[in-house]
């Protein structure tokens, strides 16, 4: 049986080197600001502070399909990270390896 991607389906996403670097940078920036005593509340700002465990290329996380690009055979995903943040992965093809999504195995 072939599965068809659709909005709301949960898939697995494998982080690339660039994804991991981007996620780790925003989490590091948040730690550095906090260590310097800068808080968003003290600055009157509303952005999210990104807190979570370090990620690496090849790490696999659950993701929700938020857009299907049928013409390109790819999807936009909200990747659920091990922290308080998510990662928006755009135009990701189905497949194996880094920077791809795949169907989770049946348990």
For each predicted feature, which ranges?
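Arginine residue identity/basic-tract feature
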Residues: 9, 26-27, 31, 67, ...
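Short, well-ordered loop/turn sites that connect or cap secondary structure elements
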Residues: 4-6
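Intrinsically disordered, low-complexity, charged/polar segments
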Residues: 53-61, 66-107
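Short, Lys/Arg- and Gly-enriched loop/turn segments at beta-strand edges
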Residues: 18-31, 35-52
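Hydrophobic beta-strand signal
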Residues: 10-14
